[in-house]
Amino acid sequence: MAKLRVGIIFGGQSAEHEVSLQSAKNIVETIDENKFEVVLFGIDKEGQWHINNKLNYLIYGENETYIALNKSNKHIAIIPGRKHDQFIQIDMLEQLVQLDVIFPIVHGTLGEDGNLQGLLRMANLPFVGSTVLGSAVSMDKDIAKRLLRDADLEVTPSITLTRINRENFSYDQIITYLGSSLFVKPANQGSSVGVSKVINRISFDQALALAFCFDDKVLVESAINGRELECAVLGNHDPQASLCGEIVLSDNFYSYEKKYLNEHGAVVVVPAAISKEVSNNIQKIAVRAFQALNCTGMARVDVFLTTNNKVLVNEVNTSPGFTSISMYPKLWQASGISYPALITRLIELAIERYYAEQKKISHRDIYNKIDTGSA
């Protein structure tokens, strides 16, 4: 049986560029080479695309602090709408390899917010993860909360501020509604980029200034007194939930540094030490959240478990990390799906969704096949 050619897209222009490099490195090292041939596409911080060699696509690949994309490789462009040969080498105008499926592992803005997904959809390529809509609404924490509330799911209490309306809410008004212990975060960032813990007016002003550096929309949320749990979801029309995992913090904030740079910043417990009843409830909520946001393929659902066992949905991440310490693959490993098998299943789901979409008839076909009753 011929191998499927998988294009792994990584890097990107967001603040999570280095996290994406780590994720790509793990996927490349773990993917089943008996089934798949890997083609590497690195996006540098200026937004240029490079086709990379598996032997030298990273610089300082073993150093999580200094890891970087090798930008000396060929620049490429993508041609939307073609059935095959969508990628060309810019300087030679040569068509590159034909791909069977794309595994995008670009985190953050322009990577998991629907932009890259739209480009791949226009290029007529199957790709792993959610479609344009699911990616976009999940990335925007404000929109995601609205949809989750509409689906009768409880979320962390919050107020959304923009550059236009920020003066309409005073600090005193906000703490009256949300309490004095707060988190401030950009609406469209991940990996805790731009997130601050707030305990007073001074730290609130500083947190807002930082968050608005990353986005034009900012969420101010109540700091929840509870446990931070995560559940992985996998599937398309019949999604399944993994066992739950818990983030046990050395203090009360799971920052970017604790997630990726400080191995002592947090302890990941998989499976979480919770009752079967609570675990089942979180799994059901995770699947409902996945479906409410129109997700497909994969997502990691982050929740808070309060002292009275109330479950509050915090975030839904449609492009979870695949680094050596990332929760998504760990949760599935604990649930009986190995890392290579997980990658294989995600690729299968991408192709499954692609061919299901190809079967949809066009609007012209509808009018040809349906008698509208018009004269």
Curated annotation (Swiss-Prot):
EC number: 6.3.2.4
Subcellular location: Cytoplasm
Cofactor dependency: Mg(2+); Mn(2+)
GO molecular function, one term: ATP binding
EC class of the enzyme, as a word: ligase
Alphabetical list of Pfam families matching this protein: Dala_Dala_lig_C (PF07478), Dala_Dala_lig_N (PF01820)
Residue positions binding Mg(2+) 2: E315, N317
Domain ATP-grasp, chain residue ranges per copy: 145-348
Pathway per the UniProt entry: Cell wall biogenesis; peptidoglycan biosynthesis
Keyword Transmembrane helix: no
Top-level lineage group: Bacteria
Cofactor note: Binds 2 magnesium or manganese ions per subunit.
Keywords: ATP-binding, Cell shape, Cell wall biogenesis/degradation, Cytoplasm, Ligase, Magnesium, Manganese, Metal-binding, Nucleotide-binding, Peptidoglycan synthesis
Main location: cytoplasm
Residues that coordinate or bind ATP: 175-230
One GO term (biological process): cell wall organization
Residues that coordinate or bind Mg(2+) 1: D302, E315
Xref: InterPro entries: ATP-grasp (IPR011761), ATP_grasp_subdomain_1 (IPR013815), D-Ala_lig_Van_CS (IPR000291), D_ala_D_ala (IPR005905), Dala_Dala_lig_C (IPR011095), Dala_Dala_lig_N (IPR011127), PreATP-grasp_dom_sf (IPR016185)
Keyword field contains Cell wall biogenesis/degradation: yes
Reactions that this protein is recorded to catalyse: 2 D-alanine + ATP = D-alanyl-D-alanine + ADP + phosphate + H(+)
Cellular compartments per GO CC: cytosol
Assigned protein family: Belongs to the D-alanine--D-alanine ligase family.
PANTHER family: D-ALANINE--D-ALANINE LIGASE, D-ALANINE--D-ALANINE LIGASE A
Function: Cell wall formation.
Name this polypeptide is given: D-alanine--D-alanine ligase
Origin species: Baumannia cicadellinicola subsp. Homalodisca coagulata
Lineage: Bacteria, Pseudomonadati, Pseudomonadota, Gammaproteobacteria, Candidatus Palibaumannia
This protein's encoding gene: ddl
